[in-house]
Amino acid sequence: MSTSESPSSRFRELSKYINSLTNLLGVDFLSPKLKFNYRTWTTIFAIANYTGFTVFTILNNGGDWRVGLKASLMTGGLFHGLGKFLTCLLKHQDMRRLVLYSQSIYDEYETRGDSYHRTLNSNIDRLLGIMKIIRNGYVFAFCLMELLPLAMLMYDGTRVTAMQYLIPGLPLENNYCYVVTYMIQTVTMLVQGVGFYSGDLFVFLGLTQILTFADMLQVKVKELNDALEQKAEYRALVRVGASIDGAENRQRLLLDVIRWHQLFTDYCRAINALYYELIATQVLSMALAMMLSFCINLSSFHMPSAIFFVVSAYSMSIYCILGTILEFAYDQVYESICNVTWYELSGEQRKLFGFLLRESQYPHNIQILGVMSLSVRTALQIVKLIYSVSMMMMNRA
């Protein structure tokens, strides 16, 4: 994606790219009306297939609870993927509306000067960097989980599967059955990987616009401060009590800052409402997967679960890290408003500014179940809880 293109064109291309990935799974979130096609039903079949085989393996554990625990290892990933798929199906119109709204902001503001143009472009660059990190992480995890069974088979003949479920009628001791099981699990992992990646992208496409709007608020505050400083300079050159030109422009800039902060607040509220369940499912399901992986490896080392522990921790941490970055953006918004040269405002303008200042003290943070903020601090609390619960389970085992 060339940086010589306009920000709106880059954003439009990025939206289409993410939509092309979700379209592989049968969900076209840019379409005015969601239609089920063969890809949609294939995705539904893959989810049902994985769920059925996992339940079968858990119930047919041969009396060994560890086998059932290993089979349930990737239920966290199941909830994770199911949450994203259902969000696309049930909230398709809201997702589309939010993307088109962001597109309209890019179309409007890219022509308002170099400051806005640079701010919009920097957001696209930031999102592309996040996409690269997510993509590399998932590709590495997929390749590792795919190559591990082959490596162990070639090393000492041990037959393990990337995913811990068994298929009825296909014993792993039989060469043909092992190959069929391996291929079916590979297809399932491909669907899962594309779903995880595309799901993360459309969530991050929405979340990163909070950073963009925060940066644009800084630009607007700078424009207001420049006008107020110019007023102070003019006042030093004229006699006491004389009127100073530019009052209408200063009023317009102040109202522009107030309106933009209201837009910023409304957008944060809309994002929270749209992805409230999805973000909670993402973080908590990955926490569940980490706990199961940790418990399995406490009894004896199990390579697939150890790898999935790293994948789950990675998947949870990218959301929590972005949540912390968003918290810094809220602080940035409040600091920008506090830095307004308020003493150059008129009496009526100060009243308006007072309302703005009070509103900025209560940002709409991204929440997990309305209890915990999405942040690295919450991730550390979850990790401590996982360790405590795992120790308790092992002591009772």
Curated annotation (Swiss-Prot):
Cytoplasmic side: 1-39, 91-136, 208-282, 327-365
Compartments reported by the entry: Cell membrane
Membrane topology per record: Multi-pass membrane protein
Keyword line: Cell membrane, Membrane, Olfaction, Receptor, Sensory transduction, Transducer, Transmembrane, Transmembrane helix
Molecular-function GO terms, alphabetical: ionotropic olfactory receptor activity; odorant binding; olfactory receptor activity
Tissue: Expressed in olfactory sensory neurons in the antenna.
Residue ranges annotated as Extracellular topological domain: 61-70, 158-186, 300-305, 387-397
Residues that span the membrane, as ranges: 40-60, 71-90, 137-157, 187-207, 283-299, 306-326, 366-386
Pfam family, any one: 7tm_6
Alphabetical GO biological process terms: detection of chemical stimulus involved in sensory perception of smell; signal transduction
Gene Ontology cellular component annotations, sorted alphabetically: cation channel complex; dendrite membrane; plasma membrane
Quaternary structure, from the entry: Interacts with Orco. Complexes exist early in the endomembrane system in olfactory sensory neurons (OSNs), coupling these complexes to the conserved ciliary trafficking pathway.
Family of the protein in this entry: Belongs to the insect chemoreceptor superfamily. Heteromeric odorant receptor channel (TC 1.A.69) family. Or67d subfamily.
Role summary: Odorant receptor which mediates acceptance or avoidance behavior, depending on its substrates. The odorant receptor repertoire encodes a large collection of odor stimuli that vary widely in identity, intensity, and duration. May form a complex with Orco to form odorant-sensing units, providing sensitive and prolonged odorant signaling and calcium permeability.
Additional free-text comment from the UniProt record: The atypical heteromeric and topological design of the odorant receptors appears to be an insect-specific solution for odor recognition, making the OR/Orco complex an attractive target for the development of highly selective insect repellents to disrupt olfactory-mediated host-seeking behaviors of insect disease vectors. Odor-evoked OR currents are independent of known G-protein-coupled second messenger pathways.
Entry-linked PANTHER family: ODORANT RECEPTOR, ODORANT RECEPTOR 19A-RELATED
Protein name: Putative odorant receptor 83c
Organism this protein belongs to: Drosophila melanogaster
Gene from which the chain derives: Or83c
